[in-house]
Every structure is written in C-alpha cells, then in structure tokens.
Amino acid sequence: MAKDSPSPLGASPKKPGCSSPAAAVLENQRRELEKLRAELEAERAGWRAERRRFAARERQLREEAERERRQLADRLRSKWEAQRSRELRQLQEEMQREREAEIRQLLRWKEAEQRQLQQLLHRERDGVVRQARELQRQLAEELVNRGHCSRPGASEVSAAQCRCRLQEVLAQLRWQTDGEQAARIRYLQAALEVERQLFLKYILAHFRGHPALSGSPDPQAVHSLEEPLPQTSSGSCHAPKPACQLGSLDSLSAEVGVRSRSLGLVSSACSSSPDGLLSTHASSLDCFAPACSRSLDSTRSLPKASKSEERPSSPDTSTPGSRRLSPPPSPLPPPPPPSAHRKLSNPRGGEGSESQPCEVLTPSPPGLGHHELIKLNWLLAKALWVLARRCYTLQEENKQLRRAGCPYQADEKVKRLKVKRAELTGLARRLADRARELQETNLRAVSAPIPGESCAGLELCQVFARQRARDLSEQASAPLAKDKQIEELRQECHLLQARVASGPCSDLHTGRGGPCTQWLNVRDLDRLQRESQREVLRLQRQLMLQQGNGGAWPEAGGQSATCEEVRRQMLALERELDQRRRECQELGTQAAPARRRGEEAETQLQAALLKNAWLAEENGRLQAKTDWVRKVEAENSEVRGHLGRACQERDASGLIAEQLLQQAARGQDRQQQLQRDPQKALCDLHPSWKEIQALQCRPGHPPEQPWETSQMPESQVKGSRRPKFHARPEDYAVSQPNRDIQEKREASLEESPVALGESASVPQVSETVPASQPLSKKTSSQSNSSSEGSMWATVPSSPTLDRDTASEVDDLEPDSVSLALEMGGSAAPAAPKLKIFMAQYNYNPFEGPNDHPEGELPLTAGDYIYIFGDMDEDGFYEGELDDGRRGLVPSNFVEQIPDSYIPGCLPAKSPDLGPSQLPAGQDEALEEDSLLSGKAQGMVDRGLCQMVRVGSKTEVATEILDTKTEACQLGLLQSMGKQGLSRPLLGTKGVLRMAPMQLHLQNVTATSANITWVYSSHRHPHVVYLDDREHALTPAGVSCYTFQGLCPGTHYRVRVEVRLPWDLLQVYWGTMSSTVTFDTLLAGPPYPPLDVLVERHASPGVLVVSWLPVTIDSAGSSNGVQVTGYAVYADGLKVCEVADATAGSTVLEFSQLQVPLTWQKVSVRTMSLCGESLDSVPAQIPEDFFMCHRWPETPPFSYTCGDPSTYRVTFPVCPQKLSLAPPSAKASPHNPGSCGEPQAKFLEAFFEEPPRRQSPVSNLGSEGECPSSGAGSQAQELAEAWEGCRKDLLFQKSPQNHRPPSVSDQPGEKENCYQHMGTSKSPAPGFIHLRTECGPRKEPCQEKAALERVLRQKQDAQGFTPPQLGASQQYASDFHNVLKEEQEALCLDLRGTERREERREPEPHSRQGQALGVKRGCQLHEPSSALCPAPSAKVIKMPRGGPQQLGTGANTPARVFVALSDYNPLVMSANLKAAEEELVFQKRQLLRVWGSQDTHDFYLSECNRQVGNIPGRLVAEMEVGTEQTDRRWRSPAQGHLPSVAHLEDFQGLIIPQGSSLVLQGNSKRLPLWTPKIMIAALDYDPGDGQMGGQGKGRLALRAGDVVMVYGPMDDQGFYYGELGGHRGLVPAHLLDHMSLHGH
C-alpha cells in the first residue's frame, strides 16, 4: 500500500509536515487493522461454515426425532391394540360366563314351569274324567228310572230297546268327551315337546355358531304378545281352562321372543355405538326376570281359576260344562289346525309371524321357527363377540398404561430437561453479561486519551467494538437457539405422549397390520439430551476461545496492560469456573450413590427396628405362653396324680372290703360256734353267777359298775397315763382266766416297740350289745375286726400259728386292722383317729346314685371335714363339717391334709364307742378336744420319734401351762375355722398368723421377677408392695405375682400383706405381712442356643451333642452380657461345660452319665458372666443308646450266713426292671411274742410297701416311745437300727436304676426320711449288699423260708400321698430333719463298741462310706464309685457320735454354705502338708459347716460324705430361709421346682458334680417322665366282649406280668406301656409299683 493511497476507512493520508512518530503509529494501526480485517473475514467464514454444519446437524436431529416419533407412535399403537385385544377377550369371556348363567337360569325356570303345567294337566284330566263318569252314571240312572224298563207292565223288548238306546248315547258321549279330552291332552303334550325342542335348538345354535341370516325383529310383536287372549268360548261365560293353559305357554314363548328381540337390539346396536353395549346388555338381562315372573304368576293362577269354574249349578248345566275343555271352533277329536291356534294367540292376523316364531306354541312350522331362532342367535353371538373384543382391548390397554407408568417417567425426564435448560439459559445469560462487560471494558480502554491519536482511529475502534458486540451477541444467541430447538422437540414428544395416553383414536385402526411398536425409549431421550449438552459445551468453549483471541483487537500493539490483565483474569475465572463445575458434577455424581446408600441404610435400620420390636413382642408372648403352659402342665400332672392315686385306693379298698367281708364271715362262724350249747350255758348260769358274786366280795376288787361307763373323777384321770377299760361282769369272768396271757402280751409289747404283723390284744368277747346304741357301718366293721382280734388273742401263741397269722395279716392292708391293733396294743381300745380332709369337689348326695343320701354330708370344694376312723367297705368316711353336721363322706371327693393325724380325741370307755354315738350337744367339746389333741401332738419333737397318747382333755391339760389362755385361743380358732381358715395354718398353740409365708423370688432377670408365697387363707386377697408402695392386688386364691419393667441392677424390697375384711380386723392377728428383698441383674440373661441335637457317636458309649451357637455381637455379648461358653444338662443336671462362646458341639461319654437310664432329654444353656440362660429346646436321647451297654449277668437272690451276729444279703438288680416306685420307711404291726424268728420279722418289715394310711398304733410301733423303760428303750434302739438298715438299703442307687428312689411323706410319720448317697465301690455292679450287724441269730431254715415268702409276696399299690403344699416344703422338712438328726445322735447309741469297730473295718475290694450322724447299725455298699470317685486322697471317717466328737459342741447347729468356685487342695492349697485334711468341692456345691472359722480362715465341713477343712474365702453362707409354722418346716422356694443349688440344699448337701439328685417326695415333682416298671395285680383281657369296640390298642395282662410304663396316666385312667415287645394301653388300677424285691 503506497503512502499516498487513501485509507480504507476514509482517512486522509498523512501530511508531510507531520512528525514521523505519529506516521509510524498510524501505519502500524493501519497494518493492525488490515490484519484484524483478515482475521475477521476468516472468522466470519468459519462462522458461516459452522452455521451450515449446525443447520445440517439440526436437520439430521429433526429427522431422527421424526423417526423416533413415528417409532414411538407405532409402538404405542401396537401396545394399545394388544391391550385392547386382551380386554376384549376378557370381556368376551365374562359375557360368555354371564350368558351361560342366564341360560342355566332359563333352563331351570322352563323346567319348573313345565313340571307345574304337567301337574295341572294331570289334575285337570283326572277331574274331567271323574266328572264325565259321574255324568254318565247320573244319565244312566235317569234313563233307567224314567224308561220303560222300570214300569211294571213293560215288556222285555222295550227294556232291551231302552238299553240299546242308552248304550248308543253313552258311546256317543264317551266318544265326544274322552276323544276330545285325549286329543287336547295329546295336543298340549306335543306343544310342550315342540317348545322344549325349540329352546334346545336355540341353545345349541348359540354354542355352535351357525351363519347369520338376514332379517330383523318386528317391534310390534312385543305389543301383540302382551295383549290378553280373547274370549273365544261360544256358549260359556267362563274362559276355558285349556285356553288359560295355552295362554301361559304362549306368554312364555312370547317372553322368549322378547328376549331374542332384546338381544337382537343389542347386536344391532353394537355396530352403531359400541359404547352403549354395556347398558343394552344390562337391559337385555333385566328384561327376562319380570317376564318369567309373569309366566309363573299366570301358571299359579290356573288352579284358582279351575276351582272357581268347577261349580255346576244344576244337572242341566253339567253337559255344556263338560265340553268346556274342547276348543269351540273344532268339534272333531283331532287337534285343530295351526291357523286356528294362531288366531287364538294373535288375533290381528299374524303380524310379525315370520319374525317371531316363538310367539306361538306350535302353529308355525318347526323349520321356520328354527331358522329365525338360529338367525337371532347368530346376531346375538356376533354382537357379543364384537363387544367382548372391544371391551377386552380397552381393558388391556388401560392395564398396560397403568402398569407401564411411562407417563410418569416421561414427566420426570421432562422435569430434568427443564432444569438443565434453565441452567443452560442462566449460563448463556452469564456469558452475555460477561461479553457486555468486556465490551464496556474495551470501550473504556479505547476511549482512553492517547497522545497523537486521530479521530479516524477513534471511529475505527468504535466500529470494531460495535462489531465485536454484535458477534458476541450472535455467539450467545446460538446456544439459546439450540435450547429453543431442544425445548420444541421436548414439547412435541410430550404432546405425542399425551395424545397416546389420552386413548385410542379412529385413525389408529389403520395401523393394525403394521409392525409392533413400543413406547418412547428413554435411552433415546437421554442420548439427545447428552448430545445437546455436548453441543452447548462446545459452543461455550469456542466462545471462550474467541473471547480470548479477540481480546487484543482494540489494543494497539499490546501496550495496554489493563486489557491483558483483564483477559488473564477472565481466562483464570473461566478455568476456575470449569474446574468448579467439574467438581460440582463429580460431587453430584458421588452424592447420588451416597444418598441412595443412606436411604437404603435408613430403610434397613427401620426394618431392623420393626423386626426387633416384633421379635421382642413375640418373645414376650411366647414366654408368657410357655409359662402358662408349664403351669397348666404342672396342674394337670398333679390332678392326674391325685386321680390315679384315688382310683388305685378305690380299687384297693374294694379288694380290702372283700377280704374284710370274708373275715367278718369267718368271725361270725366262730361266734356261732361259741353259742352252740345254749342249754348248757343256761344250766351253768346259776353256779357261775354265784362264783362271780364270790369273786366280787374279795377284798381289793373294784366295785360292780353298770354296763355304761361312768364318769371318773378328773383327779383320777389326771393320775393315769393310759385309758382304763372297765369290763362288764360277764366279760370280767371270761377275761379273768386269760389275765396271765394278757400280762405276757403287754410285757412283750413294751419290750419291743416294733409291732410287725400279728395283734396281741386283750381277750374280750362282746356278745351282748345294747339296742339303744345303733352302730353305723364303720362301727360294725370295727366290732368285727375287734371280735376277730379277740379270737386270735385267745389262741395260744406258737411259731407256726404266729407265722400263719402274720401271713394272713400281711395280705391285708395295714389300715384294715388298725382298730384291732389299737385294742391289742393297750389294755383298752384306743379312740378312733381324727383326720382332717379337704373337699376337692362339690357333692350333693341327693343327686347321686346312693340309696340313702340323707345320711351323707353335702360338700363344697375347699371345705374342711373332720374324719373319725378309717374308710368303710363302701368307700365312705364318718365325718363332721365345721357347722357340726355329721354323716358319711365319699372318699373320692376328699383329700387328706398332710400331718393332720390327731390321736384319740375321745375318752376310750367302750370298745364299741364310735363317733356316731356322741350326742349332738358335744360337738363343741369334740372340736375343742381335737384342737387340744392337735396341740399336744404339735408339741412332740419330730426328730425324737415320740408320740404322746392323749386320752382326754384333762390329760392334755396336765401338759399345758396356761389352759385358760389357750382355751380362749381355741374358741377363736374354732370361729376362724368356720370362716374358712385352714386349721393347720392357723398357727401353733393358737397363735393367729395370717401373714403369707415362704416368700420366694424366682426367674429374676434384669427387668422382671416372679414372687410366690403360701397364703394362710385362700379366701382373702393379698396386696403386693414394691419398695413400700402398693404395686398390685392379687385376688383370693392367687399366690404368685410377676413384676415387669424393673430397672437392671437395682435393689428392691417386696412386701406381701393379706387384706382382711373390716369385721376380721377387730381381732389381733399379729403379723399380717411378709417381706423379702432381691436385686435385679445388670443385664441378660443370654439367649439359649438353638437346634439342639443328640446323636450316637461312631464309638460305642459316646453321644454327640450339637447345637447352633447363640448369636453374639462383635464384643461377644448376647442380650448385653458376655458369653463365656455353654453348659450341657441332662434332665436338669449339668453333665459338662464347654468354655467356648462359638462352640457348636461336644461329646458325652457313658461314664459321665450318673443315672443314664433315667435320662430322656438333653438341653444346653448359654453361660455368661451374669449367669446361665434358660434351657434350650430339649433334644431326645436315642432310645437304642442304652441297649448297647450290657450289664454282667447277675445270679438270683442269694444270701450268706456267716458270723452269728452278722449276715449279708445280696439282691440282684435288673437294669431294665428295677423299681421306680418311691418306697418309704414304715413299720408293719408285728407280734413280738414269738421270739424265735425276729430275723424273719425283720425281713418282712424290711420289704413291705408303705401303707396308705398309718395308724397311731403302727406309729407307736415304729416311732413312738412306749411308757415302759429298761428293756423297752433297748428294743426301741434296736428297732430303729433295723429300720435304718432297711431304709438305707432301699435308698441305695446303682447305675442301672431308672430313677433314684425317693420317700413319700406319709401323714403322721415323724420318722427321719433323710437319705445319704454313698460313694463306695462295689465288686459286682448290679448288686446291692446289705450287711447287718444287729439282731439275734436265726436258723438257716427259718431264714430261707422267710426270704422265700418275702419274694413271693405281691406288692401293694403305691401309698396314698396327701397333696403337698409345694415341692420345696418337703425338701425343707427333710433338711430340718437332718439338723435334728444331729441332735438326736447325741442321745442315741447302739450297744457295744465291737460293732463300731467292725463297722470301721474296710471290706475287701470296697470302701465303706459312712453318712454323717448315722445311727443305724448297718454297712451300705453302692456300685457307683466309678462314676463318683472319692474326692480326697485322705478319707476322714465320721464317728458315730457325729460332729460333736470332732470338736464341736452338741448344741452347735450346722450351717449351709455354697462353693463360689472349684477347689482342689492338691493343686490350689497354700499348705501342701495340710492339703490331705482339706476337701475337694466344686462351684455351686452346697456344704455343711459346723462352728466358726479357725485362725487360718478354714471351716470344718462335710462334703461328699467326707469331713475336712474348707477355705472360707471360697465359700459363702446360704440363708436356708426355713421357718417353723405349725410344727412344719417350709422353704421360701414353694410352688416351683428349685434349681440344682436348692435341690442340693435339701438333699443333704452331699451331691458333687456328676452325681444325680436323690429326689424326695412324689415322683410328680420331676419335670420329665421316665419309664417305670410296674407289675400287674389282676388278669385283664381287653377282648372279653365287655369292652365292646373300646378294647383295640390295649394290652392283655396276667397277674404277675411286668409292664414298662411310659409317661403319666391319661384322662381315662390308662398308662401307655410295653409288655413282651408289644405296646399299648394298660389300665392303671390293675398295676402295682414294683420294689426291690420284685421281679
């Protein structure tokens, strides 16, 4: 470019006079401007190319969007068509089902109407026939009467002519009547058949789908059908019946036509308006019901019309009336032509007859009606099919649209696109703002004054700035335009979706045959969105680059530092903005999964919380249900036990009654033998009377007294300890010769207090009984037994006779001869026994089957009855209620209260004096007397085995200090007894104690606890206080309460108080409440393991116990406590522990099972620092596990007779047939007069079963103390030694025992029933050895005979045990007996020290275990040393004197300690030299301790039947918690089965780990049933015919069969047992419990 060339911008060239710097600057500006122009042009070319490319891209996008739209439309159309087809198909099926239902209903209506029509036709026909015959008969009679034949002068010709004419008339009449009637009936039958065929053809045509025929129904047919039939009878005022019948049929056919036309209307309407099909169909369905009702109503109205029409007024009108049945237009017999009938049905001449073939019955041809019917059916089927298809298609489309939910997804996509569009719009606006700011900055930079700048340069800068601003605005508008296009595409897609979702259109039918399309693909929308976003971002980057490149245009030569700084700041800001945007996107991407994870975690947390709450609630409910089930099971088992014992007692009583009757018969025979010589007695009467007078005149003889006993002075009664017997003169004479025998018997009875079999009574013969003393049934049985006892007493005693008599008495129940034994044990008969019973059920004697209910007492459940004497042969007691009423009481409705035996409460004045002989006015004295006697017996110490026999109130008064005070208390006791208070619970010596006793806490957890108590009265409620705040009120009769919602680790104080009514509060009751404290656990207990399984190991004699470990958290805790391991229990006894929180199995060897044959189930508990969990679900031990262990063969019963003072008896014990019955100590009545066989008598007493009821005389023999001294005391010690030997033998255990034997607490027994378990070895397992060291020598032959007889004896049923107040009361009572036994050991000492030394000598191959405080002279051996090894190397044997010989005083009581941890002195003792004197014990084992700690903090203790020292730091003293009420010792643990620690407490504190418990009391206290071995007493055949069909599944028994019994007795009195390999039901009343001397 030349210097003088004009400037492109119109600027003039520089003048020569200008300075060169300005020209240079201007030149530079021009060059820069040219450069900028070139760049601008290049940029514009690039922009144009970019625009073209964008336009092509836009067209491509539009085409793709159009294609996608078409695809979306095709998919929507195909889906809509598929949905419509499905909905139409469903609608068609529904319509078809409705149609079938309508057809079935129509068929039922038609059949019903046809049956009605047939019945009407038959009745009409019968009536018409009868009427026609009657008319014929009347006509014949009239013709005969009025004819010539009836005249006297008529000839035979005229008569014959009359008869011929009569026959012709009758024939014509018969032809007219019968012919027309028969034709009419045939016609109606044919009409019915045709109508049935038409209807069937109509139905078949609907199902077969015949081709359509042209034709339309006549709308006037409906009106013509609804018109009534015209009266067509020509000579009658009544409408003919066949016309009415025909009208009903025609109306029915007309209704069918209406139905067909309605359906035809539906088919015609289907083509015009498919939407109205449903309403039309509904109307068509509804139009049939009223028509059918009208037809039925018309049919029902026919009989009424017929009755009204059959009333002929006279014989003249009968002939026309007989022709009413024939149609008037036709007199001929055949049916009328169809035209006539059509006139009848349609008088207007057949309008619409071609289109409605069903309007008439048979006038139209069958072909035409069938054709039209097929046509109508086809039209209906077609319309129905179209409608069903349409409805089904619509329904499917609607379901698909609702199920797909695409509109909602599309809406969400649209919302997201809108949000992104808003963001892009904001970004574009921000870019525009920034461009505007840059433009302003450039303008300010350009407008800055530059020295030497010309006006042309300024204008050029302005123009460039404006151009730059336009370019920037165009660049900003490009993304906005793209956004608008995207928005338009979105709107089009949304509109398309809205049109598709709005419903199908008519134009969519054209695309029915096209390809199947789908909904708008969400991926395509996402792809378009991503592409648009990428495009916008690319434009933004280009804009930013252009801004960066074009920022230097307004500057001249880069001299403006401000523009460069601004550009750098802008670039930095843009980069920072992009970086922040990317970070935001990344954070948003990361936030979405995090948000989803948070929502999922929250959802899982809520679900876990809900599940936890549900599980807690379910656990609580199941726990409550389990507690309730356990309680119900316990109650049921107790009731079953009572019922079983009652049934056994009833059966045994029946046998005893038969035996008593036999004895009575024998006694009567003997009395008759004594009275066989009355004449001789009369002759000898006078000399005998003189002899009696002479004897009475002797000095010192008591004066003669009348037969009735006179009242003795009270001072004389006080001076005597034994009731005196005043005999009658006659009896005195008879008894005088036998006085020597009587004195001998009394001396022998005093010398030996153990009476074992025979009675030694005073000879007495009561031959005369005054008539003024009526005897009850009980008194008669007593007199019989006493008379027979006197007969036995008069016979001289000899060894043979005594043996026979003993065997006879042994066959009977001991209580059956209790009265005879009482009279035989003293000079006078003892008073009847007073026992207290409680009524178990309500009983009204007048509702029973007895013949004399007036002599029985009505009973109410819970009442106390005072029983005198024993049960009679009918099973009744003589009793008295609290209100003084006396009478007979049925034994099966009452149950005896424990320790309620009261010795004779009446003065013994006559051998026949019974309770029934007392006057009614002496009731109060009797009650007071019984209470005083009860107090006297309550004063007797249980451990001293003494019983004070009280004869009268004055004798008791000598033993009591303050009689007046006690008399007042007795009066109050009587009044309280009448108010429902239990006399045994009223207190000792009249102390009125109403406070609940034996409070015990059980099931103590962190938040709950259960308290139980024993109430003094079941008629008053109790208030439970928690921390001296009233917590709850329990109703009367409830003795337990459960605390809920307690705080963990908190000390609580519970007080239970009885709430009495206001009238009883006036009496001073002493204490009315009891208090107990407890602490809740800190946490826990842990949950028990699951899925416990017991399997046999591959090795013999090994069991594998597996379980599912409890779920623990990361800290190893379950339910908040640390899990330390698991403990395995077998039937409640711990056998092993596993010190691993995750252990799942363990192995049990046969040597670990102490009494394996008794075990049935194994449970596992979870151990923790806060105790053990509840038992898991028990697992059954395999039955074949014990079969693999064969015990060595045992020889039969044998004995050895060695030293004269000692002998050994060996009893074989069968592992499968050992006794399960709990034998108890008892002393059978025995005649000590025969001194030649004491050992045989000992064996008899040794093996006898416990009696059901123990009489005071038998108690006198076994535990009472005779009034005599000297030889009597020695005999008593000897008897106690023998008794101890017998009991210790019976209570030994062996590994073969099914169950450890136990002792049942018999009423009235005060014998110490505490047993010790030995730990000595035995040379031969399976044998029980008895080594006696006391008693005189017996001849071998007598020993053998006695032993054989003992083995032959059949065992009686298990003794009746009265209801126990609680399991732990028995244990507490036995524990108290142990404590008293120590005191008793100070007073008792067997003769000689030689036997003591012999007792200390060890047996070869065995070690003798000696129990603490033993007072028996026998050695006990037990084959269980392999299972229970000796715990210490040094055996410290207990001397006979008890602990007082070891340094403790006689009055030092034993205390109970519990071991806090395991202790082995050989390993853990600090002084190894003294370790031999220390005992080995295990954790939670109970120890008996005497005295206090020594200087080394050691106690003197007894453990495992060894005495030694124990460290005081490892034991803690237990509060036994017994209290003495009513001379009974009770434990707080009443009402539940105690834990192992409590059981060990009350079992004598000698049970180490690995040994079984010697449970005392009834076997029903055991939680699980074990098999029992019983013996059949009688034969039983279930198939003898008496059982009927009930004998199936029962076993046949023979007397002596041994039966294995499984489980308790059922409701019908049967056991489930096994005999000879067969299992079934056996009757419980025919089974006896076996003892050791059984089979």
UniProtKB/Swiss-Prot annotation:
CDD domains found in the cross-reference section: FN3 (cd00063), SH3_RIM-BP (cd11851), SH3_RIM-BP_1 (cd12014), UDM1_RNF168_RNF169-like (cd22249)
Compositionally biased region (Polar residues): 707-718, 761-775, 1293-1305
**Is Repeat found in the keyword set?**
yes
- Please provide, alphabetically and separated by semicolons, the GO molecular function terms listed in this UniProt record: benzodiazepine receptor binding
Which GO BP annotation is one of this protein's? Answer: fertilization
Q: Does the keyword Membrane apply?
A: no
Q: What exactly does this protein do?
A: Probable component of the manchette, a microtubule-based structure which plays a key role in sperm head morphogenesis during late stages of sperm development.
Name a single GO cellular component: cytoskeleton
Q: What is this protein called?
A: RIMS-binding protein 3C
Coiled-coil portions:
21-143, 409-442, 480-619
Domain Fibronectin type-III, chain residue ranges per copy: 995-1083, 1088-1184
Compositionally biased region (Basic and acidic residues): 1392-1406
Q: Where is the composition biased (Pro residues)?
A: 326-339
Record text on subunit structure and interactions: Interacts with LRGUK (via guanylate kinase-like domain). Interacts (via C-terminus) with HOOK1 (via coiled-coil region). May interact with FASLG.
In which residue ranges is the amino acid composition biased (Low complexity)? 776-790
Where in the cell is the protein located? Cytoplasm, Cytoskeleton
Q: Member of which family?
A: Belongs to the RIMBP family.
Q: Which UniProt keywords apply?
A: Coiled coil, Cytoplasm, Cytoskeleton, Differentiation, Repeat, SH3 domain, Spermatogenesis
Q: Where is this region: Disordered?
A: 1-22, 215-240, 295-364, 697-811, 1251-1273, 1292-1325, 1392-1413
Q: Name one Pfam family in it.
A: SH3_2
In this chain the SH3 domain maps to 832-899, 1452-1520, 1569-1636
Against InterPro entries, the record matches this protein to: FN3_dom, FN3_sf, Ig-like_fold, RIMBP1/2/3, SH3-like_dom_sf, SH3_domain
